[in-house]
Structure formats: C-alpha cells, structure tokens
Amino acid sequence: MSVLFVNGSPNPHGNTAALAAALLKGRKYEILHLTDYTLGSYGQQLPGDGLDAVIAAMKAADTIVVGSPVYWHNLCGSVRNVLDRFYGRVENGGLSGRRLYFVFQGAAPEKWMLEAGEYTMKRFAALYGMTYGGMATNRAEAEKLNQTL
C-alpha cells in the first residue's frame, strides 16, 4: 500500500506535518509539499504549472492524507487551489479505490471552521470516488485514526 501526505502548509516541518506524522506513525509514506509546486488559481495557466505532477502523485497512491493549517477560518490557499483545479481536469470517480484522510489544525479553530473544512474534504472524496477515512485536528484524533489505516 502506498501512502501520500499532501502537505498544504508553507512550513514543511510545522504543526500540520507533525499531525500527519502522528496519523501515519509506523507507516512508510511519501510527502508532497504543495509549496514546492507552482499552483495557480482555477482558470490560470502559469509557466511551470505543477498541478499535473500533484494529480499524478495522488493517482499513484492508495491512501492520501491531505493536510492543511486553518487559515482565515478555512482550508489554506494551496489546498483550496488543488481542490478547485481538480474540477474539469480529473473525471468524477477519477481517484476511485483510494482512501482519503484529512489533518486540519490551527491555533484555536472554532467548531464550525473544522466542520466546514471536513465538509469540503468529504465532498472532494465523494466526487472523485475515494473512501473518506476521517479528520484529525489533534494528536489524540490522529492516533485513533492511525488504527484505521
């Protein structure tokens, strides 16, 4: 089983990565840092666009963990750009057979912020045919989800 952690945080060794490490403890996994890729907004075609590489890495994985810090009450921009740009580029069901987990952390997110982020990830999973495994917002939740991998 191949596992990919898609890190949306601009800090490759920050709290989002630490939460993913807790979720993935004891497992081998690859890390894709979105900050290493040129990823414009939906509708943009930038030189050196990295979306195809991100999509290919996600298609190659059996289990995908998307990580985002809570910025402005929601997903960070890099994760949002990837989700937005999947639309029309990846067919519905295009990630069938894969499992998706979500790590989402911030200084003091309110319940509605976490619910909004998870709603988005559940919809993303459903649209592209993935089984949604759950969300971890703290170490205890990550350790519990680890048992389901």
Regions found by a protein language model. Name each.
Residues M113:
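Rossmann-like NAD(P)(H) cofactor-binding subdomain of soluble oxidoreductases
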Residues P109-E110:
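Rossmann-like dinucleotide/flavin-binding elements
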